[in-house]
């Protein structure tokens, strides 16, 4: 038996309220579902990516770099770090530095909500957390259709772009060069 819909505040709309069904998945269910997709894709191809959004742009990182996808966690602040490093979280006893990709890419800051997602990635045997607006999907990319680091004026520096791909709906997906995001002097904060 389905529960009746309720009225809930809609943060993304000019409407004050919208109907929400109890049966709609919440943030925890959506993250759990994506975790299962990530596990399945990691066992398949090296051409699988996890997509996420910042503002209206869609970005993707190689699925092999994804260690974990978690909801917002309490962040311990650190002094004397760049503004895009929000601090560290304790992930099962390991301190993981957290980078807000909006700030790293020069976008305006956004308040964290229950839908904010932390992508935990492993680069050179180090864990790093990336704050993203939301995680969208698992995408299998045909490498022959990737345009390598195009010369265009984008919101982010091209040093963080590995390439650009058009998905099945002809929407542009920006492939992020995860190792390029990490400069050793910026990431020693969690390993002192």
Regions found by a protein language model. Give the residues of each.
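An acidic, low-aromatic, low-complexity terminal/linker signal
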Residues: 1-192
């Amino acid at each position: 038996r389905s529960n009746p819909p309720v009225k809930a505040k809609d943060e993304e709309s000019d409407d004050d309220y919208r109907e929400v069904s109890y049966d709609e998945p919440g943030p925890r269910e959506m993250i759990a579902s994506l975790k299962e997709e990530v596990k399945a894709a990691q066992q398949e191809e090296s051409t699988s990516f996890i997509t996420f959004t910042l503002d209206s742009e869609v970005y993707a990182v190689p699925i092999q770099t994804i260690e974990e996808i978690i909801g917002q966690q309490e962040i311990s602040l650190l002094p004397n770090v760049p503004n895009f490093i929000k601090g560290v979280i304790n992930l099962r006893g390991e301190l993981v530095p957290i980078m807000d990709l909006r700030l790293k890419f020069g976008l305006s800051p956004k308040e964290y909500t229950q839908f904010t997602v932390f992508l935990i990635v492993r680069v050179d045997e180090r864990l790093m957390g990336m704050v993203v607006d939301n995680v969208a999907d698992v995408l299998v990319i045909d490498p022959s259709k990737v345009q390598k680091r195009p010369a265009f004026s984008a919101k982010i520096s091209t040093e963080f772009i590995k390439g650009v791909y058009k998905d099945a709906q002809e929407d542009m997906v920006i492939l992020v060069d995860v190792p390029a995001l990490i400069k050793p002097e910026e990431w020693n904060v969690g390993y002192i």
